[in-house]
């Protein structure tokens, strides 16, 4: 592809951007639909602390397509942009930049100072975001952005929380939750599910000696650091356990019977003592592994408890319980009154109780703990295991599960409402509804919403010393209770506010909300609901449409659903498109460090935004599957789709200007069949696009219009070219111009939501003064039923299928299309052959064949062969396949033709018969010498490849035409330039030229020909003959 072509597309897009901006087109589209039905759209807010990447551009493109389409379809579509400002992503950037990485560093720096630093960097990359949003062609309203750190937004978040609290859906409790030691704060379950990795961890089996006899319980774990906090062992009361004696050590071990072979594969290595039930082990006491919490024995620690969740598929059938560090452990121990100890601080280091490992990071302590157990003969096995483990989504550090005091939303109480809400949501792709999202809802657990962090919306709870709570609903309420003017709701403005009421002093609890709570409250908080714009907010709820990546099924989609179902018993959105992840070309995650992907700016500067948009939209990534990004793929879209479309427009413009065609001259024209076909295809495309957009299926909407560009450029224009070239004005030429104008104009509107730059550029070159100012101010086209001709579309599809077969045969057997052939035979259904016989000349012209014959039976030049389809028949007939193969080989051509006509046959196998259908039999064709054959689903095509002298001479003439016109193109001659040529060639080429001189001159606008003795100009190979050609422009 010429570099000039690539450069022209980005340059055109920059001109379109300038036009949109100078003419305020986006604002005009809003004004144009003011008063029309509103299409409600919620935009998932990004953080501006990082640069936008392909994932953002993908989601932004999807949103833009749907919103542009809804606008053109007659809706008012407000598109407010929002910014996520709170939470770990911002805090983490400030911590790194200021070196506040040690425990207590932020408190020493000062919460006020830290929060103001957070406020400063929130919009670090806002200009870059605006650039990329504009450059990708996305229209959003940056003049009315909302921010999660705005006072109005935060007040609405308080209202949401207060409403949940009033319904009894908020409580304080201690639970084991995912915990980031790097951040020093708990995370929600859905955050913990966002970043799993395959890692190698320790795998150890510890020995727990019973107190009342010499038996030793074996328990397996992949977290040796939790053994320090062991408070109980659990067994399944319904399982069978065994007691054996290890012959080498003499020790007696107790473990699950089903796990015995896993740990003792050598039957001779132990002595069998006996079986015992899990129930009989319950209540037995054992010796603690470590001395740190021996005093807990009097409170119920270090005994065996029952647990039904234990399985023997892994481990030993005995489970070590550290109730502070495992959710199942926590509930089981709580049920059986086992105490809880938590000797790990928020940074993941052992506290002073663990004297031998105090201050050591728990994961680093694994080896030391295992070594100590080994030295004290308390370690049965030590190894490693590869498994999936959760990592912090922001810091990429391992998470732990830790018992913390937190505030929770009672999600499990409203789970039934969430599941009901999901039933009314239209998901694209559909499998996510009851798959990834539905299953996540079914397993939803209470949401830990409090974070012991700094930069976030403070939880509006004030508590007195005796535990009474004041849950504040609004700024006005806080001002009335505190007597202070409130100008900001962040921690450093309100933490010191003390409320005095009924003789008590109330102090705020030291937590902020999980920033996902902010995001989930966005439908209300963006409008300061219910304090302002209540009617508007309620009218636009739920959203008609949202879109984000697959990870948001456990993020924003989820939190939106939790809050909307809890507050209003409704979904937060009606329709959602879920996209997959854009990976680097090597299949790995895109990484700046690895430099394994091209920058989005480079791609758009090289190929243009529309090429990138279309590449993404026409890929599996819009169906929630992963895409390996390839700049070659973007280039292919430009070369194979956008450039041909641009050439089609240039073709129309060139000849319309040359012959002075006006779009107003389009009445009372008699259209050719090919005109009626392309118009029928056009309005069928309108219908398909509308149907697919109604289902929010962007991939299905894009694919047909890409196919249509092929129909338009490689069939309609190519087949109609001579009609446009006619020098004399005629009704047929006017019909061709009128048809092509209508197609290009309507098509510019069809593609406008998807590739808005290309559409605008086309439209501006086609529009007349009375047309709307921009394609994006037009209505989306409607189906014109009287122009849709299904039978004609089917016939043309058959013709193109036959032509494709013919081209494949020529390519396979190295027969240039410029070389004419005498005969072609088409075999197919009788009723289709009759219709196609009327267009034999069209097929003949396209394939350069003199005579096209249509047959309902295979001609004598071809033998039809049938063989069993082993995949289809294998399971059904088993070892009788050879018999069937032999019987099929013995069929006559008449019998095979009968099978092809009927679609089934009854085959005799000795005294038995078997019925076979088309799926059971593979059909192929064997052509006689001089003939070649190929089949499609509907037809068999046979070419007569025998070349006579007249055919050879015509082939040379056509080859000469090709070489001359190639020279015209390379020399950038105008389409009307007349030329003189000088030709040096062998006798056969000269004879061919003389024989076809009129044809050659007409096709190349040649007015003078000279045969010369010496080589001159460019040298060419003309069907194996060396030829030199030179040309000169001699007129117009």
Swiss-Prot record:
PROSITE patterns: AA_TRNA_LIGASE_I (PS00178). Keywords: Aminoacyl-tRNA synthetase, ATP-binding, Cytoplasm, Ligase, Metal-binding, Nucleotide-binding, Protein biosynthesis, Zinc. It comes from the Bacteria. It holds the Pfam family Anticodon_1. GO terms for cellular component: cytoplasm. A motif ('KMSKS' region) lies at residues 589-593. The keyword Iron does not apply. It is found in: Cytoplasm. It catalyses: tRNA(Ile) + L-isoleucine + ATP = L-isoleucyl-tRNA(Ile) + AMP + diphosphate. Its cofactor is Zn(2+). Its EC number is 6.1.1.5. Coiled coil: none annotated. ATP binds at residue 592. IleRS has two distinct active sites: one for aminoacylation and one for editing. The misactivated valine is translocated from the active site to the editing site, which sterically excludes the correctly activated isoleucine. The single editing site contains two valyl binding pockets, one specific for each substrate (Val-AMP or Val-tRNA(Ile)). Catalyzes the attachment of isoleucine to tRNA(Ile). As IleRS can inadvertently accommodate and process structurally similar amino acids such as valine, to avoid such errors it has two additional distinct tRNA(Ile)-dependent editing activities. One activity is designated as 'pretransfer' editing and involves the hydrolysis of activated Val-AMP. The other activity is designated 'posttransfer' editing and involves deacylation of mischarged Val-tRNA(Ile). Belongs to the class-I aminoacyl-tRNA synthetase family. IleS type 2 subfamily. Monomer. PANTHER family: ISOLEUCINE--TRNA LIGASE, CYTOPLASMIC, SOLEUCYL-TRNA SYNTHETASE. This is Isoleucine--tRNA ligase. The lineage of its organism: Bacteria, Pseudomonadati, Chlamydiota, Chlamydiia, Chlamydiales. The gene is ileS.
């Amino acid at each position: 592809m010429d570099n000039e072509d690539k450069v022209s597309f980005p340059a055109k897009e920059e001109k379109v951007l300038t036009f949109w901006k100078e003419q305020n087109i986006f604002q005009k589209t809003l004004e144009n639909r003011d008063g029309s039905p509103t299409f409600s759209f919620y935009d998932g807010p990004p953080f501006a602390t990082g640069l936008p990447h392909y994932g953002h551009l993908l989601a932004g493109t999807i949103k833009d397509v749907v919103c542009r389409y809804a606008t053109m379809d007659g809706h008012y579509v407000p598109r407010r942009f929002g910014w996520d400002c709170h939470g770990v992503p911002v805090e983490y950037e400030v911590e790194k930049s200021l070196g506040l990485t040690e425990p207590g560093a932020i408190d020493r720096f000062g919460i006020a100072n830290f929060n103001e630093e957070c406020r400063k960097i929130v919009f670090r990359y806002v200009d870059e975001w605006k650039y990329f949003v504009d450059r990708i062609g996305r229209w959003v309203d940056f003049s009315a952005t909302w921010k999660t750190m705005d006072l109005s937004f935060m007040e609405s978040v308080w209202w949401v929380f207060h409403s949940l609290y009033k319904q009894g859906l908020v409580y304080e409790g201690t639970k084991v939750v995912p915990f980031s030691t790097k951040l020093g704060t708990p995370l929600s379950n859905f955050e913990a599910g966002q970043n799993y990795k395959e890692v190698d961890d320790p795998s150890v089996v510890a020995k727990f000696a019973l107190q009342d006899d010499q038996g030793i319980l074996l328990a397996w774990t992949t977290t040796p650091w939790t053994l320090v906090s062991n408070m109980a062992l659990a067994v399944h009361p319904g399982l069978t356990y065994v007691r054996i004696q290890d012959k080498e050590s003499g020790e007696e071990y107790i473990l699950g019977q089903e796990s015995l072979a896993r740990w003792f594969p050598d039957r001779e290595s132990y002595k069998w003592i006996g079986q015992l039930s899990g129930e009989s082990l319950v209540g037995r006491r054992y010796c603690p592994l470590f001395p740190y919490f021996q005093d807990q024995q009097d409170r119920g620690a270090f005994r065996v408890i029952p647990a039904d969740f234990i399985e023997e598929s892994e481990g030993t059938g005995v489970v070590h319980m550290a109730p502070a560090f495992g959710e199942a452990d926590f509930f089981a121990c709580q049920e059986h009154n086992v105490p809880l100890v938590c000797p790990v601080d928020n940074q993941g280091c052992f506290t002073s109780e663990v004297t031998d490992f105090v201050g050591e990071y728990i994961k680093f302590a694994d080896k030391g703990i295992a070594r100590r157990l080994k030295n004290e003969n308390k370690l049965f096995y030590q190894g490693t295991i590869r498994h999936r483990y959760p990592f912090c989504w922001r810091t990429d550090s391992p998470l732990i599960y830790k018992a913390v005091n937190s505030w929770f939303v009672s999600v499990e109480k409203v789970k039934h409402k969430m599941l009901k809400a999901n039933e009314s949501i239209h998901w694209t792709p559909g499998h996510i509804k009851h798959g990834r999202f539905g299953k996540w809802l079914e397993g939803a657990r209470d949401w830990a919403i409090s974070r012991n962090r700094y930069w976030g919306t403070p939880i509006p709870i004030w508590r007195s010393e005796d535990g009474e709570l004041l849950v504040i609903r609004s700024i006005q309420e806080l001002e009335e209770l505190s007597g202070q003017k409130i100008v900001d709701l962040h921690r450093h403005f309100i933490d010191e506010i003390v409320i005095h009421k009924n003789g008590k002093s109330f102090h705020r609890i030291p937590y902020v909300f999980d920033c996902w709570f902010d995001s989930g409250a966005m439908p209300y908080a963006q409008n300061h609901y219910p304090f302002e714009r209540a009617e508007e907010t309620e009218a636009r709820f739920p959203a008609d449409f949202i879109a984000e990546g697959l990870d948001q099924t456990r993020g924003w989609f989820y939190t939106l659903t939790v809050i909307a179902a809890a507050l209003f018993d409704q979904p937060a959105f009606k329709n959602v498109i879920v996209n997959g992840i854009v990976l680097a070309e090597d299949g790995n995650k895109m990484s700046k460090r690895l430099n394994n992907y091209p920058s989005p700016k480079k791609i758009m500067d090289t190929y243009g935004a529309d090429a990138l948009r279309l590449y993404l939209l026409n890929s599996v990534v819009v169906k929630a599957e992963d895409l390996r990004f390839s700049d070659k793929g973007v280039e292919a879209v430009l070369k194979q789709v956008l450039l041909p479309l641009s050439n089609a427009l240039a073709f129309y413009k060139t000849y319309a200007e040359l012959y002075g065609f006006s779009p107003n001259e389009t009445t009372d024209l008699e259209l050719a069949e090919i005109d009626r076909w392309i118009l029928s295809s056009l309005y069928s495309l309108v219908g398909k696009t509308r149907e697919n957009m109604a289902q929010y299926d962007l991939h299905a909407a894009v694919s047909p219009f890409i196919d249509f560009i092929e129909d338009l450029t490689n069939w309609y224009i190519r087949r109609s070219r001579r009609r446009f070239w006619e020098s004399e004005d005629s009704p047929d030429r006017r019909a061709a111009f009128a048809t092509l104008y209508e197609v290009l104009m309507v098509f510019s509107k069809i593609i406008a939501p998807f590739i808005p730059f290309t559409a605008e550029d086309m439209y501006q070159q086609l529009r007349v003064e009375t047309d709307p100012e921009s394609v994006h101010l037009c209505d989306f086209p409607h189906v014109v039923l009287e122009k849709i001709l299904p039978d004609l579309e089917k016939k043309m599809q058959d013709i193109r299928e036959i032509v494709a077969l013919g081209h494949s045969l020529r390519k396979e057997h190295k027969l240039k299309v410029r070389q004419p052939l005498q005969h072609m035979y088409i075999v197919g259904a009788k009723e289709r052959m009759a219709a196609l016989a009327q267009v034999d000349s069209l097929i003949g012209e396209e394939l350069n064949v003199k005579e096209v014959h249509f047959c309902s039976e295979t001609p004598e030049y071809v033998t039809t062969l049938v063989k069993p389809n082993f995949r289809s028949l294998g399971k059904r007939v088993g070892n009788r396949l050879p018999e069937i193969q032999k019987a099929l080989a013995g069929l006559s051509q008449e019998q095979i033709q009968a099978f092809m006509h009927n679609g089934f046959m009854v085959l005799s196998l000795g005294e038995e018969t078997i019925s076979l259908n088309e799926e059971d039999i593979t059909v192929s064709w064997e052509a006689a010498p001089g003939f070649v054959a190929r089949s499609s689903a509907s037809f068999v095509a046979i070419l007569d490849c025998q070349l006579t002298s007249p055919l050879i001479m015509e082939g040379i003439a056509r080859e000469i035409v090709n070489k001359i016109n190639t020279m015209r193109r390379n020399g950038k001659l105008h389409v009307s330039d007349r030329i003189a040529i000088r030709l040096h060639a062998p006798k056969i080429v000269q004879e061919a030229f003389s024989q076809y001189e009129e044809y050659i001159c007409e096709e190349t606008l040649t007015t003078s020909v000279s045969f010369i003795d010496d080589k001159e100009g460019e040298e060419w190979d003309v069907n194996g003959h060396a030829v030199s050609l030179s040309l000169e422009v001699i007129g117009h």
